[in-house]
Amino acid sequence: HVGLPTDRYEETISFYHRIGFETYDTEINGASRVCFLRLNDLILEVYECSACTQQTGAWDHIAINVCDIDAAFEYVTSEMPLQPTCVQKLPFFERGVRFFVITGPNGERVEFNQYL
């Protein structure tokens, strides 16, 4: 899993639900709420933190693999008030990869990725 501290707990969970994650488990750790979110084999641990940086740093990005990058881009731009990067291509792996990046409510970068 990938841990994500937040002082915007509800907003963060809602954001990840909207891009396909489902709540896997919820816990209380002392005075902090913890929510585990799952998308296929990827687990995010979202936990309350009163002194969060609100910028990239806790992680640089997470990548979500998709089968159709153009459909994912269309969904994100039509359903969410976000300004993603344009779909880009890199010559990684055997045939390359296409991707775009959005920014979550804590400044985290979320990459949508399609292997070609």
Each model region followed by its residue ranges:
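Short glycine-enriched loop/turn motifs at secondary-structure junctions
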Residues: 54-59, 94
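Conserved beta-strand in the GNAT
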Residues: 45-47, 101, 111-113
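Active-site beta-strand termini and strand-to-loop segments that position acidic
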Residues: 37-42, 102-105, 115
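Core segments of cupin and vicinal oxygen chelate
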Residues: 3-44, 93
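Short beta->alpha transition motifs characteristic of CBS
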Residues: 2, 93-94, 113-116
